[in-house]
């Protein structure tokens, strides 16, 4: 039965990803076509001094701006991204449809689910069995005294010594608190 759940979840996940990707590719077909023809996300008829330099930078013979900015070497941490390149990257990131635009991830997830024809809930946890209800009744602890609430004083001597009263060599002179003292302490 668990294999069935696994394959069902796998198929549902595949369908959800496929439908989400197909919906995104349909909306971006024009952008990807422009990217294939010009090398950038511009329309093919856009000409100007800027588009030629960008195509030359993105060509196979030279490094593009992104590759130049991501240089990992002995000066790691000392190289900074140029301000204009940083602005270009931020604009490109903001133009992406799946880019993070300051929205919470729950909103992005609901937008993806609303655009997809299927809704998938992955059930991976095993179903819980209901716990049996036990009615607990207290039973007396065998070998114990019945009166738990009373103060039981421990015997002053261990039973192996054979004594059952505290040793008092000066009988009559010890104060146990049972009678008042003839004198009072001044505090």
UniProtKB/Swiss-Prot annotation:
Signal sequence bounds: 1-22
Similarity remark: Belongs to the pyrokinin family.
One Gene Ontology molecular-function label: myostimulatory hormone activity
Keyword Signal: yes
Positions of post-translational Leucine amide modification: 76, 142, 161, 171
Propeptide part(s) removed at maturation, as residue ranges: 23-64, 80-127, 174-187
Protein name as it appears in the record: PBAN-type neuropeptides
